[in-house]
């Protein structure tokens, strides 16, 4: 297994992955901003919230590298060429919707933090970006694809939950909706294209029934991981689940708060529901 990821096989139809909770900052990162500022990009502690899942037979994949080093939830075409010392030799994304995040500094390799602080005071070589793709992006995506394929082969369907956390209020350079106050959860299926809407509705109803506020496809619809590995017509369902960080941690200090235990219990009940759900019967 690649040292940049942690992957645990499962026996059930359910696959969970956490692409943004990594905290291993490679010496070759050579960032210029403060570490505390950079760490605001993390989905800190998400892997701890779901640490019960592998014991239930759920496949688990997590990135150990930090999101700001390489964002595994982006395509390798989402290149910010303003960061590079030479033209990118591969294809570069041209879709204006996708490129809106690159313009905010949030491409495959981040240029700026959510508050707009520059991450580098240097240009990156094409070779070092290629090395990050080879050592981080490729093994992460291979592990997610393998886990989903294995779940689908065993059961005839797969449910993939792409696990994230979000700040209570959107920062100025984080989304196209700066200053927006987030719900407790945002459930995203890219407008019904990555999962059965009945399955998505079941998740939304379950969380709302537990007393949480739940938004749907706004402001987060899901990005590359749910897009790439979903095919509802073939019973491959992928859903992005965003959790408001104030439910379980102090956003300033990154320390776990007293709400962690109750939130984890809610997530355990959600996982139990999904393990009992066959989307083909919905």
Where are each of the predicted segments found?
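N-terminal catalytic or cofactor-binding beta/alpha core of small enzyme domains
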Residues: 1-160, 165-282
């Amino acid at each position: 297994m690649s040292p940049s990821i942690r992957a645990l096989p499962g026996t059930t139809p359910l696959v969970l992955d956490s692409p943004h909770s990594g905290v291993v900052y490679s010496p070759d990162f050579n960032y210029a901003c403060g570490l505390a500022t950079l760490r605001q990009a993390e989905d800190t502690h998400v892997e701890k919230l779901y640490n019960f899942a592998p014991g239930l037979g759920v496949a688990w994949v997590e990135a150990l590298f930090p999101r700001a080093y390489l964002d595994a939830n982006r395509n390798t075409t989402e290149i910010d060429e303003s960061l590079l010392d030479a033209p990118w030799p591969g294809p570069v994304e041209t879709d204006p919707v996708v490129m809106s995040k690159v313009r905010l500094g949030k491409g495959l390799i981040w240029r700026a933090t959510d508050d707009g602080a520059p991450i580098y005071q240097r240009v990156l070589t094409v070779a070092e970006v290629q090395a990050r793709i080879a050592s981080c992006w490729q093994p992460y995506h291979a592990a997610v694809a393998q886990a989903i394929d294995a779940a689908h082969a065993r059961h005839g369907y797969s449910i993939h939950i792409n696990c994230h956390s979000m700040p209570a209020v959107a920062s100025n350079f984080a989304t196209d909706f700066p200053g927006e106050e987030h719900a407790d959860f945002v459930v995203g299926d890219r407008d019904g294209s990555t999962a059965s809407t009945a399955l998505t509705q079941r998740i939304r109803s379950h969380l709302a029934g537990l007393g949480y506020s739940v938004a749907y496809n706004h402001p987060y619809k899901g990005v590359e991981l749910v897009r790439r590995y979903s095919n509802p017509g073939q019973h491959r369902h992928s859903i992005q689940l965003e959790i408001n960080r104030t439910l379980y941690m102090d956003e300033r200090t990154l320390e776990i708060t007293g709400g962690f235990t109750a939130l984890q219990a809610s997530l355990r009940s959600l996982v139990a529901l999904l393990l009992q759900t066959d989307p083909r019967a919905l």
